[in-house]
Amino acid sequence: MAQEAVLFREALGEVLRAERMRRGLTLRELSGRARISLGYISEVERGQKEASSELLASLCEALEIGLGTVLRVVSDNIVAAERAHAPITLPVGANSGDVVASAA
């Protein structure tokens, strides 16, 4: 069975929504601060729209969080999701048949 790919836009949307909620902001408040339509922000948060670099910069500024921080959290979340769904492989020694790595 093929592993479902983690989409960047979905991971980004989850991080942006979590940050907005952590700050206690409504979509309407964030929309006003970022000067981006409420509907578009909602679609970005749900992973339905790709955020341009300009839009992402506006959202980060409105959320008072650095772009690098957002991208690092998104990257960490993607890596964690990929690891959680990665098949477990146990390489064995070439001649001895001894296990040289474990799944732990």
Language model feature labels by segment:
Residues M1-R22:
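A short, Lys/Arg-rich alpha-helix, primarily the initiator
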Residues L16, L27, L38, S53-L56:
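Helix-turn-helix DNA-binding elements, focusing on the entry/boundary residues of the two helices
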Residues R20, S31, C60:
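The alpha-helix within a helix-turn-helix
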Residues T26-S42:
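Short alpha-helical DNA-recognition segment
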Residues L55-C60, V70:
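Hydrophobic micro-packing sites on short alpha-helices
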Residues R72-A104:
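Short, charged recognition helix plus adjacent turn
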